[in-house]
Amino acid sequence: MENRLKAKYENEVRPSLIEKFDYSSVMAAPKLEKIVLNMGVGDATQNSKNLDEAVEELGLISGQKPLITKAKKSIAGFRLREGMAIGAKVTLRGTRMYDFLDKLVNVSLPRVRDFRGVSNKAFDGRGNYTLGVREQLIFPEIDYDNVNRVRGLDIVIVTTANSDEEAHELLAQLGMPFAK
């Protein structure tokens, strides 16, 4: 089954981007490259069970097995040793990436309390967009009764756009609800 968002990108979004920014070829039009989900679990240093729960939740949200991230350096103030497991991340590409973005835009973000749109200022100057989610409960896969702790996660949307303006246009046309 072809992905709804991918089809929308190919049939509507890409042609309108080519027209708006006057690209010389179809391949020059910006597209989504990957989406990285990251959950930092700082308290995993004291209680490793917290990390297992975060990994399981991230797996449910993304539909693939997360990679456990480890500390690069020891920091005494945080009681952290080099090599300790302190978080989990997932990199989505291809069909799963489009599925996740579709779900994020149409299901999860509207479930955020007092949601007025995502920030317009979270671009990094290279055409990538970063978004923080305060609680994992906005995702339909997470069962409220099984959650013992509210955790947030970072979502980074990496595009091939050369500028923030192009990336903003790409995401807006894919349905990202930017704040007015």
Curated annotation (Swiss-Prot):
Alphabetized UniProt keyword annotations: Ribonucleoprotein, Ribosomal protein, RNA-binding, rRNA-binding, tRNA-binding
What this chain does, per the entry, is described as:
This is one of the proteins that bind and probably mediate the attachment of the 5S RNA into the large ribosomal subunit, where it forms part of the central protuberance. In the 70S ribosome it contacts protein S13 of the 30S subunit (bridge B1b), connecting the 2 subunits; this bridge is implicated in subunit movement. Contacts the P site tRNA; the 5S rRNA and some of its associated proteins might help stabilize positioning of ribosome-bound tRNAs.
This protein's name: Large ribosomal subunit protein uL5
Instruction: List the HAMAP family hit by this protein, alphabetically.
Output: Ribosomal_uL5_B (MF_01333_B)
Tell me which species this is from.
Answer: Limosilactobacillus fermentum (strain NBRC 3956 / LMG 18251)
State the family named in the UniProt similarity comment for this chain: Belongs to the universal ribosomal protein uL5 family.
Which molecular-function annotations from GO does this UniProt entry contain?
Answer: rRNA binding; structural constituent of ribosome; tRNA binding
Task: List, alphabetically, the GO terms of the cellular component aspect.
Answer: ribonucleoprotein complex; ribosome
- Describe its assembly: Part of the 50S ribosomal subunit; part of the 5S rRNA/L5/L18/L25 subcomplex. Contacts the 5S rRNA and the P site tRNA. Forms a bridge to the 30S subunit in the 70S ribosome.
Q: Name the GO terms of the biological process aspect.
A: translation
Top-level taxon of the source organism: Bacteria
NCBIfam families with a match to the protein in the record: PRK00010.1
Would I find Protease among this entry's keywords?
no
